[in-house]
Amino acid sequence: FDTATHKQQWLDLNNQVFAHHPDQGNWAMADLDNRIKEDWFDPQGFFLATEKGVIEGFVWTKIHQDLVNQDPVGELYVVGTAPAHHGRGIARALSVEAINYFVTKGLKHAMLYVDADNEKGLKLYQSLGFN
């Protein structure tokens, strides 16, 4: 993820993917910029699938290091695929890449949040070992 070149395109795709989701689907550039300024933001942990410069899917990670008496935990913070590219395994491939990123950072645990009615997401995450 390159903040100079990907921000607007990612924001547009995020808002499309999560149009139905009140917390995630109506972001303005200021929302994205605020998160990029957070101490936890790492562009190396923001994975994109692109074809000819167009973002087809993404996994944005977050590492929680401020946990009391616990090791840091990696979070699959936002996962999305452009509707035209559903079913191609993009979210799976990027999620695996993100989990491998956590391993390279020495993390032993990963987590995510998913809505209970997101059947495709639940199936994907369960197949990756989340429960």
For each predicted feature, which ranges?
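A short, internal acetyl-CoA/4′-phosphopantetheine-binding micro-motif in the GNAT/acyltransferase core
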Residues: 77-86, 115
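A conserved beta-strand-loop-helix scaffold within acyl/acetyltransferase catalytic domains
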Residues: 21-79
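A conserved short alpha-helix in the GNAT/GCN5 acetyltransferase fold that borders
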Residues: 86, 95-103
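Ligand-binding pocket scaffold of soluble enzyme catalytic domains
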Residues: 8-9, 47, 58-59, 90, ...
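Conserved active-site alpha-helix within GNAT-family acetyltransferase domains
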Residues: 88, 92, 116-131
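Helical hairpin unit composed of two closely spaced alpha helices linked by a short loop
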Residues: 77-81, 99, 108
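Conserved GNAT acetyl-CoA-binding A-motif
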Residues: 102-113
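A short beta-loop-alpha structural element at the N-terminal edge
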Residues: 1-12
